[in-house]
């Protein structure tokens, strides 16, 4: 009886934060299948020496633990690492949604990490940014374990995760975006950004952000304009921004601010690349035939930057 009560209490603790489960691969498939009847949910091909370790705790505060899934080749050492951030409008989604993409990129000679971070029902901006930057430090601190070269780190995100990836990459070692409670010998600096259909500016002529952005940014633009500005990668892009790849769908609003950021990168002679997948929907990376192109564009870019 005592064991049962302890088990139940642990379950209550584990669910003491809000979870929005509305954004899933299957729900996205159901929305798209009528317009795109040829699509198939993407499946991964596992390399013979590839290893997956799930639910590694990278940070814990009181009863709340944050996890990551690690994917790496046990025969190869000092691989470039790819930190992966799922989408879901900053309020839904989970790290499992990055597993197929992680496995595919791992099979090409990289170590990949799918990150759990706190979403807007649980924590407002910039807490999720702190979480991913803490995960980067954790990966660097454990570089030998994960077969990682700590000086070759890319951050990749999809949709809202793409927005976060761009913000993380454009705020390298900016103390405003560092969690002072997290103790590490490593920095959160990254050397490359892959933004997959994520906006670069919240308030922009091309942007159409509304309720979900307001929930994450703790208010509408009129209520909290500073957060809307500070959370925009375009606001931070400068001569220190790392090489950047933009992979986009055919929907323009999901790359709001991209062309302005490219102008800054070009002005500073920073390598950047744009790949648009024609006639594709948002969330194209979940499905074939588009996952294959996503992997191809990502790995060719990473090879150019790191190898």
Could you describe each region identified by the protein language model?
Residues 1-21:
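Bacterial Sec-dependent N-terminal signal peptides
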Residues 15-307:
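Alpha/beta-hydrolase superfamily serine-hydrolase fold, recognizing
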């Amino acid at each position: 009886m005592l064991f049962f009560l302890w088990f139940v209490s642990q379950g209550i603790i584990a669910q003491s934060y809000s979870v929005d489960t509305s954004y899933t691969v299957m729900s996205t498939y159901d929305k798209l299948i009528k317009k795109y009847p040829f699509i198939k949910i993407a499946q991964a091909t596992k390399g013979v020496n590839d290893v997956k370790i799930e639910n590694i705790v990278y940070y814990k505060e009181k009863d709340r633990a944050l996890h990551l899934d690690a994917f790496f080749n046990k025969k190869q050492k000092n691989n470039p690492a790819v930190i992966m951030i799922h989408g879901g409008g900053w309020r839904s989604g989970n790290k499992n949604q990055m597993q197929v993409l992680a496995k595919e990129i791992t099979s090409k000679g990289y170590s990949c990490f799918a990150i759990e971070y706190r979403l807007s029902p649980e924590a407002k901006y910039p807490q999720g940014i702190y979480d991913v930057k803490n995960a980067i430090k954790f990966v660097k601190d454990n570089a030998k374990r994960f077969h990682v070269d700590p000086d070759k780190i890319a951050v990749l995100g999809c949709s809202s995760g793409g927005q976060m990836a761009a913000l993380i990459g454009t705020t390298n070692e900016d103390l405003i975006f560092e969690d002072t409670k997290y103790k590490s010998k490593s920095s959160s600096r990254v050397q490359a950004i892959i933004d997959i259909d994520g906006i670069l500016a919240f308030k922009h002529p091309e942007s159409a952000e509304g309720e979900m952005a307001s929930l994450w940014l703790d208010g509408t633009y009129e209520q909290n304009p500073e957060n809307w500005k500070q959370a925009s990668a375009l606001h931070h892009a400068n001569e220190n921004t790392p090489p950047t790849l933009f992979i986009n769908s055919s929907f323009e609003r999901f790359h709001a601010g991209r062309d302005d950021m490219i102008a800054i990168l070009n002005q500073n002679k920073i390598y950047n690349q744009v790949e648009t997948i024609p006639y594709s929907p948002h969330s194209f990376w979940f499905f074939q035939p588009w996952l294959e192109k996503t992997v191809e564009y990502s790995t060719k870019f990473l090879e150019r930057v790191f190898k």
